[in-house]
Swiss-Prot record:
Positions on the Cytoplasmic side per record topology: 46-697
Organism: Mus musculus
A single MF term (Gene Ontology): long-chain fatty acid-CoA ligase activity
Pfam family, one: AMP-binding
GN (gene name): Acsl6
Protein name (Swiss-Prot/TrEMBL): Long-chain-fatty-acid--CoA ligase 6
Cofactor: Mg(2+)
Reaction(s) catalysed (UniProt annotation): a long-chain fatty acid + ATP + CoA = a long-chain fatty acyl-CoA + AMP + diphosphate; (5Z,8Z,11Z,14Z)-eicosatetraenoate + ATP + CoA = (5Z,8Z,11Z,14Z)-eicosatetraenoyl-CoA + AMP + diphosphate; 15-hydroxy-(5Z,8Z,11Z,13E)-eicosatetraenoate + ATP + CoA = 15-hydroxy-(5Z,8Z,11Z,13E)-eicosatetraenoyl-CoA + AMP + diphosphate; 12-hydroxy-(5Z,8Z,10E,14Z)-eicosatetraenoate + ATP + CoA = 12-hydroxy-(5Z,8Z,10E,14Z)-eicosatetraenoyl-CoA + AMP + diphosphate
Record PANTHER family: LONG-CHAIN-FATTY-ACID--COA LIGASE (PTHR43272), LONG-CHAIN-FATTY-ACID--COA LIGASE 6 (PTHR43272:SF54)
Length: 697
């Protein structure tokens, strides 16, 4: 065929030909074609787009060459561990100054009174108040430099951040204190850290500190600064024992009149000493540098940079304790980008009201709260039809999530999930959970229902909060993600638990610029945690999955041996039993002189009555807790879950006690991160545990 003939055949029709074609169509056909074209155009422009992962999800980490089995993140393609993300933000002082510059003196710290809208302090106001407070501290015998430790004993509020920034402005070190440490622990920390100044929020905390001084337990404490108003009687009481009681406003006024030029810290300078709670013996003070904190949140930024990068219009709700590094690292990310942090009113029961008023975009949360959300959602689906529809809608959304689509505007959102999203303010685009294992079932459902990206991290205070993090696009559950770009992770044999690295299992060890410098004045426990090569031994047992992600499978800490010689990790068992529908909280107890386990169960007051009714058991919550048939039904449900999860018979509890009141931070049975305080639980339920063993024998 000739070239000219081919071109003639392939040529586009002339406009006159097209016009003639369309004129030959009926009006009905033309309308139909137009409607079809409009629908197609709308679909093309509005179709949901899958999130593009930053790496191959089948290979999220790789072995380090000559690293003894250590693995690293593949994100970023650099073999060097990440120490910082921005050259102008290498200390916590610089992080805040960067936010001040980016925001253009925008809103920074928010607070609200009951039934009132949020009020905001600007970045410039916060920075100025921090300089005045820091200068005032210097006028009251504090010294510039990392030898000066300042205690902060307060609930989350703007003044906490101002006090922290005041310390950083003059290279001083922050030491958070919190109620659940207990009176004995607080005096131990004040003495160990040589703290002469403590900043508190409420008068009763100042009174507690004065009692220690009056008993001559903390002779070095000389100044207590109060954020809230107080009576003259408190000031007079302080004078009698040699402690100056002053308002935070008075210290700021003093600093305004006697201003000192900032003396910023260096990356290697100590920034904060976080004392752990919930363990036996005295608290351990983890020493973290500015570089530690910056490296940790830089790892988070690197992982998420192409998918959900922080913005100036981001708003974070702050309710997790600021004494915990998980909350502090997430807040640092927000400040670094000129975002806003709004504080809850101080009552967790009003958190939903605060979120509706604040409308946050970032929501850091612990798994226990996610579990409560999940239980409440399904409890409200109070008929079999409602539950079926809810599960059906969730499955449709979960199918989208598996294909990488995260959205909140589907038909299923309109019908079912928008009310749930509205309860969180309606603007949440990122949820980060950590501090404890999250249930795969709960995480999978909420990723669908909340229509936002839900990330899970793993770590501990000693590695500045996180060492692994969900890779964007990997919305599978049952693991804690891949190593952050700021650290390597390796597994080592745990012989006593029969975990071996040759099987890809072992104790999790972390090394990198986010790993702490040791415990304050505690060489013995520092050597237990950090080996001679700088590896942090976490005490957790992990397993590498084929995709290069890490799965937490056990815990070396808190393990004990039963009388027959079998090792038991109670937290692993508790994480299985907590999935029982009527169970809100559980404590599994074992003894080396006993051959079996027993448990303390707190039923969920919102779920348990209806669950019991289905079993034919009637009564109020208090009445149900006393009924033997209900106790048996709950135990049977727990044991069934244990069997389904592969627990050995010796890992199953043989008897339980039903307790009506929740374990809480206030009653001393939970840490501020809502983890069980096992020694306290053991002592609190000593009588009930003894009775369980007697009856079971």
């Amino acid at each position: 065929m000739q070239t000219q003939e081919i071109l003639r055949i392939l040529r586009l029709p002339e406009l006159s030909d097209l016009g003639q074609f369309f004129r030959s169509l009926s009006a009905t056909t033309l309308v139909s074609v137009g409607a079809l074209a409009a629908v197609l155009a709308y679909w093309l422009t509005h179709r949901p787009k899958a999130l593009q992962p930053p790496c191959n999800l089948l290979k999220q980490s790789e072995e380090v060459e000559d690293g003894g089995g250590a693995r690293r993140s593949v994100i970023g393609g650099c073999t060097q561990l990440l120490t910082h993300y921005y050259d102008d933000a290498r200390t916590m002082y610089q992080v805040f100054r960067r936010g001040l510059s980016i925001s253009g003196n925008g809103p920074c710290l928010g607070f609200r009174k009951p039934e009132q809208p949020y009020q905001w302090l600007s970045y410039q106001e916060v920075a100025k108040r921090a300089e005045f407070l820091g200068s005032g501290l210097l006028q009251h015998d504090c010294k510039v430099g990392t030898e000066q430790f300042v205690g902060v004993f307060a609930q989350n509020r703007p003044e906490w951040i101002i006090a922290e920034l005041a310390c950083y402005t003059y290279s001083m070190v922050v030491v958070p204190l919190y109620d659940t440490l207990g009176p004995g622990s607080i005096s131990y920390i004040i003495n160990t850290a040589d703290i002469c100044t403590v900043i508190v929020d409420k008068p009763h905390k100042a009174t507690l500190l004065l009692e220690h001084v009056e008993r001559k337990e903390t002779p070095g404490l000389k100044l207590v600064i109060l954020m809230e108003p107080f009576e003259d009687a408190l000031r007079e009481r302080g004078k009698k024992c040699g402690v100056d009681i002053k308002s935070m406003q008075a210290i700021e006024d003093c600093g305004r009149e006697n201003h000192h030029a900032p003396v910023p810290p260096r990356p290697d300078d100590l920034s904060i000493v976080c004392f752990t709670s919930g363990t036996t013996g005295n608290p351990k003070g983890a020493m973290l540098t500015h570089g530690n904190v910056v490296a940790d949140f830089s790892g988070f930024l690197k992982v998420t940079e192409k998918v959900i990068f922080p913005r100036q219009d981001d708003v974070l709700i702050s309710f997790l304790p600021l004494a915990h590094m998980f909350e502090r690292v997430i807040q640092s990310v927000v400040y670094c980008h000129g975002g806003r942090v709004g504080f809850f009113q101080g009552d967790i029961r009003l958190l939903s009201d605060d979120m509706k008023a604040l409308r946050p975009t970032i929501f850091p949360v612990v798994p226990r709260l996610l579990n409560r959300m999940y239980d409440k959602i399904f409890h409200q689906a109070d008929t079999s039809l409602k539950r079926w529809l809810l599960e059906f809608a969730a499955k449709r959304k979960q199918a989208e999530v598996r294909s990488g689509i995260i959205r909140n505007n589907s038909i299923w959102d309109e019908l079912f999930f928008n009310k749930i999203q509205a309860s969180l303010g309606g603007h949440v685009r990122m949820i980060v959970t950590g501090a404890a294992p999250a249930s795969p079932t709960v995480l999978g459902f909420l990723r669908a229902a909340l229509g936002c990206q839900v990330y899970e991290g793993y770590g501990q205070t000693e590695c500045t909060a996180g060492c692994t993090f969900t890779t964007p696009g990997d919305w599978t559950s049952g693991h804690v993600g891949a190593p952050l770009p700021c650290n390597h992770i390796k597994l080592v044999d745990a012989e006593e638990l029969n975990y071996w690295t040759c099987k890809g299992e072992g104790e999790i060890c972390v090394k990198g610029p986010n790993v702490f410098k040791g415990y304050l004045k505690d060489e013995d426990r520092t050597k237990e945690a950090l080996d001679s090569d700088g590896w942090l031994h976490t005490g957790d047992i992990g397993k590498w999955l084929p995709e290069g992600t890490l799965k937490i499978i056990d815990r070396k800490k808190h393990i004990f041996k039963l009388a027959q010689g079998e090792y038991v990790a109670p937290e692993k068992i508790e994480n299985i039993y907590i999935r029982s529908e009527p169970v809100a909280q559980i404590y599994v107890h074992g003894d080396s002189l006993k051959a079996f386990l027993v448990g303390i169960v707190v039923p969920d007051p919102e779920v348990m009555p209806s669950w019991a009714q289905k079993k034919g058991i009637e009564g109020t919550y208090q009445e149900l807790c006393m009924k033997k048939e209900l106790k048996k039904a709950i135990l049977d449900d727990m044991v069934m879950l244990g069997k389904e999860s592969g627990l050995h018979s010796f890992e199953q509890v043989k008897a339980i006690y039903i307790h009506c009141d929740m374990f809480s931070v206030q009653n001393g049975l939970l840490t501020p991160t809502l983890k069980a305080k096992r020694p306290e639980l053991r002592e609190y339920f000593k009588k009930q545990i003894e009775e369980l063993y007697l009856v079971s024998v």
